[in-house]
Amino acid sequence: MQYEDYILRLFWEASLPVPHPLGIVEITPEREYLLVTEFINGAQEAGEAEIDESVIDQGLAAVRRMWDIGMAHRDIKPANLLVRDGDLFLIDSAFAEVRPSPWRQAVDLANMMLVLALRTDAERVYARARRQFSDEEIAEAFAATRGLTMPTQLRRMLRQQGRDLHGDFLRLLPFRLPPVHIQRWTWRRFGLTVVTVAAAGVAAVVTVGLLGSPL
């Protein structure tokens, strides 16, 4: 809860289009807390709202601003983009990250473009994106984004529409970059895991020995 409040305040202070944070309310001491924010009354999710060029520009500008301040939202999907009277709001910062990897930031861009294209088309979104991002940045975003890097809701809506928006964006690019593989395991991570397990085993043996020895 404290982390989400902190992230939301960083977004707010950086002039990102997020609900105004109003603080934390304690419901049950040391157990339940509630993060209070401005309520975006009358807003619609991006998957249902009318998306015009102004809204597209606002969504892309939000990603550019996060890049500039060294942050990533990490959960850009229709439910987390609200539109009211032509204004876009970015909500739910629980998974946001400070000083993310370039890969994380690239994924934010591709997911934002995919969400905005759900109610428009890849051509319009790509044309607007080129006003704020280079072709190389957009190519990197779509090289990093596919399958598990897309939020579940976004993948489901793409399937329901029967549109290959990811493929549409790739076809618009002047060049493609090799897909960035999600590396779940590396030799370094494997080695650290083995060392940790071995150390835990040694500690357990020593503890059992001490407990079994006479005082």
Positions of predicted regions on the chain:
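Regulatory N- and C-terminal appendages and interdomain linkers associated
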Residues: 148-215
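Conserved short alpha-helix within the protein kinase catalytic core
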Residues: 49, 53-60, 64
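C-lobe/activation-segment region of protein kinase-like
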Residues: 91-155, 164
